[in-house]
Design a protein with these regions (language model features):
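Short solvent-exposed coil/turn linkers within tandem alpha-helical repeat scaffolds
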Residues: 107-117, 131, 146-155, 181-190, ...
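Terminal, low-structured helical/coil segments at or just beyond the last alpha-helical repeat
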Residues: 23-24, 28, 203, 207-252
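N-terminal positive-inside, membrane-proximal cytosolic segments immediately preceding the first
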Residues: 1-39
């Protein structure tokens, strides 16, 4: 018997015990039981009804989000000329992003309180970016960035940093990446946010700042045996780029 089943059986035993005590009390206090019982029944109906409705909405939101993701991942006609009949394609990435965006926005508007709805808002921001609608993208991603869920907020901040970099607002991008680098998100691990920050510094010509950040990642991202972690390996490569070989140099 797995742990989940044991927990469920324990809850059922507790419920049975409480019910038995309740029946004994009701036999001795009939009038009070009628009055209190009516109120409790109403409360239970509200709670159970609300929980059922929330589950139903979450499932509906997940299905709608899945449909939107299917559109977002649909093949482009130029990349898949021999697509089987019935498979929808798009002429280019912008058209695909626009179609998916409409669906993501609808899911976010209708199911915004559910987790799929929150992820739909994030994807709405991403697809706005791909459409070139920077204003709408910023608005959506700012909302995601302020989410109470740290992992969801981190996704919003990372995408927003990318948007700001595209817009030439590097100072704003740096602040977001610095914030992510100090966090503990699982969706945007701190070390990888720091790598992004180093790359941004490098693109701005701030080589000393880039090397400083990469060196910090290289020194800190290690396992228990002192071996470099994934981010540490990337940081090491950034700090010590391999020169192009003779064959590569001739081909350039």
């Amino acid at each position: 018997m797995d742990n989940a089943t044991k927990r469920q059986l324990k809850k059922q035993d507790q419920f049975i015990t409480l019910t038995e005590h309740g029946v004994d009390w009701a036999k001795q206090n009939t009038q009070q039981a009628i009055i209190i019982g009516a109120a409790v029944v109403v409360l239970i109906l509200l709670i159970v009804g609300g929980y059922t409705l929330f589950n139903h909405r979450s499932n509906a939101a997940a299905n709608a989000f899945g449909d939107a993701m299917q559109t977002y991942q649909a093949p482009l006609a130029s990349q898949a000329p021999n697509v089987p009949p019935g498979i929808k394609t798009f002429p280019d990435a912008k058209a695909r992003a626009s179609a998916a965006n409409t669906q993501f926005v609808a899911v976010a508007d209708q199911y915004g309180m559910t987790q799929p709805g929150k992820m739909a808002l994030y994807m709405a921001g991403v697809t706005y970016m791909e459409e070139g609608n920077n204003g709408a993208a910023e608005e959506a991603l700012k909302k995601v960035s302020s989410s109470w869920n740290g992992d969801t907020a981190a996704l919003g901040k990372s995408a927003l940093a990318g948007l700001y970099e595209q817009m030439g607002r590097n100072a704003d991008a740096e602040k977001l990446l610095e914030d992510l680098g100090k966090g503990s998100s699982s969706t945007v691990p701190p070390y990888f946010a720091q790598l992004q920050l180093g790359d941004l510094y490098q693109s701005e010509g701030k080589t000393a700042d880039a090397k400083r950040v990469w060196a910090q990642v290289k020194d800190k991202d290690k396992d228990a045996k002192g071996n470099p972690g994934p981010a540490g390996q990337v940081a090491s490569e950034r700090l010590n780029p391999q020169p192009a070989g003779p064959g590569m140099a001739m081909s350039q």
